[in-house]
Regions:
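Conserved active-site "lid/cap" helical segment
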Residues: 1-87, 96, 159-171
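Conserved catalytic cysteine-centered active-site region
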Residues: 5, 17, 56-108, 119-155
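Short beta-strand segments
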Residues: 7-8, 109-115
Length: 171
């Protein structure tokens, strides 16, 4: 197995980005990561792009996100692959990128991800998020993601306000 390194990181600015589409937002973060790695001008060395996204098809009515990102960033002929694994899509995409390099499939891969949920109402967004739970085990028994969030503090001795970054011990 070959050694693998993450050579750049990037993200969008924080705040309301509803003036941009999903691929724009992923492009901003990806360009930021490539710039951090000093590879923006040499981006054609990227052989495969792994895109983490769980809601593009439902929320944004766009399923060809990975190939759209490759085109938007002028990365052709890089292979494009969408990785959807619910709330674990990001870590799954990173695992795929790691494996592609480690096994020798590619020498250079880019992993990116993003969600754009401001295009729907709060109720539609909430309904979408509820689909992330296991339909036969969690959702049918009334478990919700906020309910899981309430379990966290007592189990790990954390203050509830720490999750929002507003209380003692927040960064």
């Amino acid at each position: 197995m070959r050694k693998v390194a993450i050579v750049g990181i990037g993200h969008t600015v924080f705040g309301n980005l509803s003036d941009f589409d999903l691929v724009d937002i992923m492009s901003f973060a990806s360009a930021n990561a490539l710039d951090d790695a000093d590879l923006l001008k040499e981006r054609k060395i990227i052989e495969q792009v792994f895109v983490a996204n769980m809601g593009g098809g439902i929320i944004n009515h766009q399923t060809g996100i990975a190939s759209a990102l490759v085109s938007r960033m002028d990365l052709e002929p890089a292979m494009a692959e969408l990785v959807e694994n619910g709330p674990a899509s990001g870590s799954s995409a990173l695992k795929c990128g790691f494996a592609a390099i480690a096994c020798g499939l590619v020498d250079v891969a880019m992993v990116t991800g993003g969600e754009l949920m401001r295009t729907v109402t709060g109720w539609k967004g909430t309904d979408f998020v509820s689909t992330l739970l296991h339909p036969e085990v969690e959702y049918n028994y009334g478990l919700t993601l906020p309910a899981f969030g309430h379990v966290y503090p007592p189990l790990y001795g954390a203050l509830r306000v720490n999750r929002a970054g507003t209380g003692p011990g927040s960064c």
